[in-house]
Amino acid sequence: MATSAAFLKGDFKRTGKMELSDEQKSQMWINSVNSENKEALLAWVKETGIELVQINGQRKYGGPPPGWIGNAPVSGSEVFIGKIPQDIYEDKLIPLFQSVGKLYEFRLMMTFSGLNRGFAYARYISRRQAISAIMSLNGFEITKGCCIVVCRSTEKSELALDGLPGNFDENMLKNVLDEVTSGVSSISLHPSPTKESQVLAVVKYDSHRAAAMAKKTLCEGSPILPGLPLTVNWLKTDMRQKLRSTDKLQQTKDLSPLPLLYTDRPDLPKETLLSAVGCLNMLCQEMKLGRPVFLIKLFSVTSFGWIRFWYQVVIPTYPTPFCGYAWMIGENLELNEKYEHARQVVAMKILSALGYIPDFSLGDVTARNAL
């Protein structure tokens, strides 16, 4: 051992005590916490040959277990175990939960000191065995006076991505996510409840593991759009309910008649109808606001082909200018086409802010500009 070697070499301070690094002191303290049960765990691991792997604050058995052939068990086969005494380890827990069914995976959440965090997850090979574990072990007295809680695991698989640009659609986001994550099964977009003119995406993955890996990737170094303050969290029940309420309110607004739709006006040229800038110019002319003046500053292209840009639009007799940041796809456009497409994106945002929504999509504008 390093400590013994240092002692034999006479590595002392003048006080006669051996000099230990902060890391060695920390390790000695960790080893001293619950040492008796830790030694029992080590003996059990050696005796059974079971393999436990420490990964990101949890210690895991299986997933899959030795000899497993085939796909992982279906959703609903995992149980949550709560109110575990913090000094109890897998040598007590795994045999207990194996007594009611075959375990595919067992995960015990751990603290830095080596104590458990009071909860774990056990995944069985079938839903029936998970139900059996709940019926048999919920309320089980694992130590004197300590009864554990066993219930169905929610197996979270949905992420909330808040702060996306307002011109994102599901296909754009899926293409980006497929580059950095795997297992996306569905995407829905909603107005952000916290960030004006931006979008919150609910992304459902095909498993909890895929969602957890995606969350880790998106939070730790693979941002969807560099420079964009994107927030990534598990989708919570209160947020789901809030989004549903917002969507219902938006549907009601969508049914209300709009004050003006330029596509209903046969006297306007088709080119004007398909141009957000043209529609904005016509609106400002009819309202006697003056012709809008656009100022656009382009930034670098991201690895996904997105361009971030700053804009300011001054409408002569409108009280305040419109300004901010926006995103667009334009990697393969010429410089003048990039500026024109940025103008179209901004014009759409301003028309929406003024309450006038032309009956065309930016997809039409993109296609026309790309020709």
From Swiss-Prot:
GO molecular-function terms, A-Z: mRNA 3'-UTR binding; mRNA binding
Keyword tags: Cytoplasm, Developmental protein, Nucleus, Repeat, RNA-binding
Predominant location category: nucleus
Keyword Nucleus: yes
Superkingdom field: Eukaryota
Repeat as UniProt keyword: yes
GO biological process: germ cell development; mRNA stabilization; negative regulation of miRNA-mediated gene silencing
SUPFAM superfamilies hit by this protein: RNA-binding domain, RBD
PROSITE patterns: RRM
Subcellular location: Nucleus; Cytoplasm
Gene Ontology annotations for the cellular component aspect, listed alphabetically: cytoplasm; nucleus
Residues of the RRM domain: 85-163, 165-245
Matches recorded under PANTHER family: HETEROGENEOUS NUCLEAR RIBONUCLEOPROTEIN
Described function: RNA-binding factor that positively regulates gene expression by prohibiting miRNA-mediated gene suppression. Relieves miRNA repression in germline cells. Prohibits the function of several miRNAs by blocking the accessibility of target mRNAs. Sequence-specific RNA-binding factor that binds to U-rich regions (URRs) in the 3'untranslated region (3'-UTR) of several mRNAs. Does not bind to miRNAs. May play a role during early embryonic survival.
Name the record gives this protein: Dead end protein homolog 1
Encoding gene, per UniProt annotation: dnd1
